[in-house]
Amino acid sequence: MARSNFLFTSESVSEGHPDKVCDRISDAVVDLYLAADPFARVACETLTTTNKIVLAGEVRGPASITKEKVEETARNAVKAIGYEQEGFHWKNADVEVLLHAQSADIAQGVDAAGNKDEGAGDQGIMFGYACTETDVLMPSPIYYAHRILKRMAEDRHSGKRPEFEPDAKSQVTMKYENGKPVGVTSVVVSTQHKANVSQADLRELVRDAVKSVLPNGWFPPEEEFYVNPTGNFVIGGPDGDAGLTGRKIIVDTYGGWAPHGGGAFSGKDPTKVDRSAAYASRYLAKNVVAAGLSERCTIQLSYAIGVSKPLSIYCDLHGTGKVEEDAIEKAVAKCMDLSPRGIREHLQLNRPIYERTAAYGHFGRVPESDGGFSWEKTDLADKLKAEIR
């Protein structure tokens, strides 16, 4: 039996966290290639450390995209985050580009040829989740953890809070009663800051950001509000800790509330089902909930390399469904082509829309006019309802 009264915690990290710097650089490279060729192939991994950026991976795209353009793209991504520190500066960091051609063995399994449809770029399992806890149909703990850091970043970029530096983390513990979120029992925020800021002043600046995003009455007790528990946090970002692409997959998704298949998103073009099928799974789960068919929904898809159709479709409505799970499984298969090509075309993923996804979650975002966050639309809800009837 599912528990109804409990505490649950999720964390987020800011755009300036070392791993998120790498995610952003990798996704900026994906956008660089897709802007030049919507069918380019990209698998770009990034490492950052003190004044050093290394990009490695496999690509297939226009020859006009030179190492110099990739380097410029990496620097611009770091500049946009705001790193102009002695140990990590967008202008002075050494950038090494080690991208090379995609393996022909992999390409032959993915490419469409003759009457053979495009296959998945790899095997794997992908999960999507949605629930009615928030207006964007995301779990509350990760939703508020993201919003705290996003507000702090907005205040830093606008100049309202020049005391903040780019690197930060948050953690929110939510109290549930009868299965519903009713308040926050603790908040942890660790943020890099200017050297001349006292911890007392920093605490009040962070308090303002937290209060601005939590519902009235949800701010935790003072003794459960933690700001930089270890003290000063002046040295941060890649100068303080090395970063790698794909190290924050739980932050990127549901904050631990739902299963994860293990595949990271950033640095991958949409032929990679690690990314595209995870987006499709979220899209399907969100539309099931938006259709009023359930209060909670988990969708799993699985694939084999070189095979176009999913090997399995699984649905769990967590005891909140108005229909049976197998009805959902049959309906989603009829309402959406879940081949890699079908997903890309339905969600229009062959666009340069990925750099913006690299921080504050890939899910629970607002669909944008240029196709960004298309997997957050609820335009399949009516079709699903009609199919089940």
Swiss-Prot record:
<comment type="function">
    <text>Catalyzes the formation of S-adenosylmethionine (AdoMet) from methionine and ATP. The overall synthetic reaction is composed of two sequential steps, AdoMet formation and the subsequent tripolyphosphate hydrolysis which occurs prior to release of AdoMet from the enzyme.</text>
</comment>
<keyword id="KW-0067">ATP-binding</keyword>
<feature type="binding site" description="in other chain">
    <location>
        <begin position="167"/>
        <end position="169"/>
    </location>
    <ligand>
        <name>ATP</name>
    </ligand>
</feature>
<dbReference type="InterPro" id="IPR022631">
    <property type="entry name" value="ADOMET_SYNTHASE_CS"/>
</dbReference>
<comment type="similarity">
    <text>Belongs to the AdoMet synthase family.</text>
</comment>
<feature type="binding site" description="in other chain">
    <location>
        <position position="102"/>
    </location>
    <ligand>
        <name>L-methionine</name>
    </ligand>
</feature>
<keyword id="KW-0547">Nucleotide-binding</keyword>
<keyword id="KW-0554">One-carbon metabolism</keyword>
<dbReference type="InterPro" id="IPR022629">
    <property type="entry name" value="S-AdoMet_synt_central"/>
</dbReference>
<feature type="binding site">
    <location>
        <position position="19"/>
    </location>
    <ligand>
        <name>Mg(2+)</name>
    </ligand>
</feature>
<feature type="binding site" description="in other chain">
    <location>
        <begin position="247"/>
        <end position="248"/>
    </location>
    <ligand>
        <name>ATP</name>
    </ligand>
</feature>
<comment type="subunit">
    <text>Homotetramer; dimer of dimers.</text>
</comment>
<feature type="binding site">
    <location>
        <position position="45"/>
    </location>
    <ligand>
        <name>K(+)</name>
    </ligand>
</feature>
<comment type="pathway">
    <text>Amino-acid biosynthesis; S-adenosyl-L-methionine biosynthesis; S-adenosyl-L-methionine from L-methionine: step 1/1.</text>
</comment>
<dbReference type="InterPro" id="IPR022636">
    <property type="entry name" value="S-AdoMet_synthetase_sfam"/>
</dbReference>
<dbReference type="Pfam" id="PF00438">
    <property type="entry name" value="S-AdoMet_synt_N"/>
</dbReference>
<dbReference type="GO" id="GO:0005524">
    <property type="term" value="F:ATP binding"/>
</dbReference>
<dbReference type="InterPro" id="IPR002133">
    <property type="entry name" value="S-AdoMet_synthetase"/>
</dbReference>
<keyword id="KW-0630">Potassium</keyword>
<feature type="binding site">
    <location>
        <position position="241"/>
    </location>
    <ligand>
        <name>ATP</name>
    </ligand>
</feature>
<dbReference type="Pfam" id="PF02772">
    <property type="entry name" value="S-AdoMet_synt_M"/>
</dbReference>
<feature type="binding site" description="in other chain">
    <location>
        <position position="272"/>
    </location>
    <ligand>
        <name>L-methionine</name>
    </ligand>
</feature>
<feature type="binding site">
    <location>
        <position position="264"/>
    </location>
    <ligand>
        <name>ATP</name>
    </ligand>
</feature>
<dbReference type="InterPro" id="IPR022630">
    <property type="entry name" value="S-AdoMet_synt_C"/>
</dbReference>
<dbReference type="GO" id="GO:0000287">
    <property type="term" value="F:magnesium ion binding"/>
</dbReference>
<keyword id="KW-0808">Transferase</keyword>
<protein>
    <recommendedName>
        <fullName>S-adenosylmethionine synthase</fullName>
        <ecNumber>2.5.1.6</ecNumber>
    </recommendedName>
</protein>
<keyword id="KW-0460">Magnesium</keyword>
<dbReference type="GO" id="GO:0004478">
    <property type="term" value="F:methionine adenosyltransferase activity"/>
</dbReference>
<dbReference type="GO" id="GO:0006556">
    <property type="term" value="P:S-adenosylmethionine biosynthetic process"/>
</dbReference>
<dbReference type="Pfam" id="PF02773">
    <property type="entry name" value="S-AdoMet_synt_C"/>
</dbReference>
<dbReference type="InterPro" id="IPR022628">
    <property type="entry name" value="S-AdoMet_synt_N"/>
</dbReference>
<feature type="region of interest" description="Flexible loop">
    <location>
        <begin position="102"/>
        <end position="112"/>
    </location>
</feature>
<dbReference type="GO" id="GO:0006730">
    <property type="term" value="P:one-carbon metabolic process"/>
</dbReference>
<feature type="binding site">
    <location>
        <position position="268"/>
    </location>
    <ligand>
        <name>ATP</name>
    </ligand>
</feature>
<dbReference type="GO" id="GO:0005737">
    <property type="term" value="C:cytoplasm"/>
</dbReference>
<keyword id="KW-0963">Cytoplasm</keyword>
<feature type="binding site" description="in other chain">
    <location>
        <position position="17"/>
    </location>
    <ligand>
        <name>ATP</name>
    </ligand>
</feature>
<keyword id="KW-0479">Metal-binding</keyword>
<feature type="binding site">
    <location>
        <position position="241"/>
    </location>
    <ligand>
        <name>L-methionine</name>
    </ligand>
</feature>
<feature type="binding site" description="in other chain">
    <location>
        <position position="58"/>
    </location>
    <ligand>
        <name>L-methionine</name>
    </ligand>
</feature>
